[in-house]
């Protein structure tokens, strides 16, 4: 059980790490469920949308003006699953402003939460190693062989998986900020933390339009 359990856990970790990196490298894509959510958030007092009256579609900014556009930055909560939301807003902005430089990244949690999340991650790996290898570090500091550790050694696979899941839960909770903060140049034009919701497509594009009018 010890050898086979170690192999299974090792494969489980490798698969988890692979999924994380693969998720980060996914190209922008549409998500119908997110689109439904954004549509449901539309307020009746939303900022008027800039629309081409003849074709009833949004105007595209002339490429000659694109070089003067400030950089659009979107900082979002990765652990909250907002990567897909960023991809969708990226497409919204690129469709209207082809020359707009857009950057996205994780909105870091408070310093102490980030440090605590790292400590939890290290502790998680250490506990899993102790369970899988069957070692007893408590013996070296005079605490003998705790009953819970004995039980974990007899059920290595299930206890390793339990530690992994609980550790991930605490790490995710500490790392989550719920943020989706949008900046145009050095000006913040939207904050999900303060407004407690993601902007609609119309609000997003109109906020960019209004901000550009102030700098032209």
UniProtKB/Swiss-Prot annotation:
It is found in: Cytoplasm; Perikaryon; Cell projection, Dendrite; Cell projection, Axon. It catalyses: [thioredoxin]-dithiol + NADP(+) = [thioredoxin]-disulfide + NADPH + H(+). Disruption phenotype: Viable with normal development, anatomy, motility, lifespan and brood size. Double knockouts with selt-1.1 are also viable with no visible phenotype. One of its GO terms (biological process) is cell redox homeostasis. Disulfide bonds join 77-80. Residues 1-23 form the signal peptide. GO terms for molecular function: thioredoxin-disulfide reductase (NADPH) activity. Gene3D superfamilies: Glutaredoxin. It is an enzyme of class 1 (oxidoreductase). Keywords: Cell projection, Cytoplasm, Disulfide bond, NADP, Oxidoreductase, Redox-active center, Signal. Its main location: cytoplasm. InterPro entries: Selenoprotein_Rdx-typ, Selenoprotein_T, Thioredoxin-like_sf. Exclusively expressed in AWB chemosensory amphid neurons. Its EC number is 1.8.1.9. GO terms for cellular component: axon; dendrite; endoplasmic reticulum membrane; perikaryon. The keyword NADP applies. It comes from the Eukaryota. Belongs to the SelWTH family. SELT subfamily. Probably has thioredoxin reductase-like oxidoreductase activity. This is Thioredoxin reductase-like selenoprotein T homolog selt-1.2.
């Amino acid at each position: 059980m010890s050898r086979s359990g170690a192999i299974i856990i090792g494969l489980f970790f490798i698969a988890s790490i692979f999924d994380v990196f693969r998720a980060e490298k996914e190209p922008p894509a549409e998500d119908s469920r997110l689109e439904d959510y954004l549509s449901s958030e539309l307020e009746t007092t939303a900022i008027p949308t800039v629309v081409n009256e003849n074709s009833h579609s949004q105007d595209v900014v002339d490429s000659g003006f694109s070089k003067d556009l400030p950089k659009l930055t979107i900082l979002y909560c990765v652990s909250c699953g907002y990567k897909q939301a960023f991809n969708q807003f990226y497409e919204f902005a690129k469709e209207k402003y082809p020359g707009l430089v857009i950057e996205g990244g994780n909105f870091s949690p408070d310093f102490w939460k980030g440090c605590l999340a790292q400590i939890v991650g290290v502790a998680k790996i250490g506990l899993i190693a102790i369970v899988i290898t069957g070692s007893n570090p408590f013996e070296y500091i005079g605490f003998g062989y705790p009953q819970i550790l004995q039980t974990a050694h007899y059920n290595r696979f299930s206890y390793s998986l339990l530690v992994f899941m609980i550790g991930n839960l605490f790490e995710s909770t500490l790392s989550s900020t719920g943020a989706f903060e949008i900046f145009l140049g050095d000006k913040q034009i939207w904050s999900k933390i303060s407004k407690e919701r993601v902007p609609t497509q119309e609000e997003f594009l109109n906020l960019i339009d209004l901000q550009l009018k102030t700098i032209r």
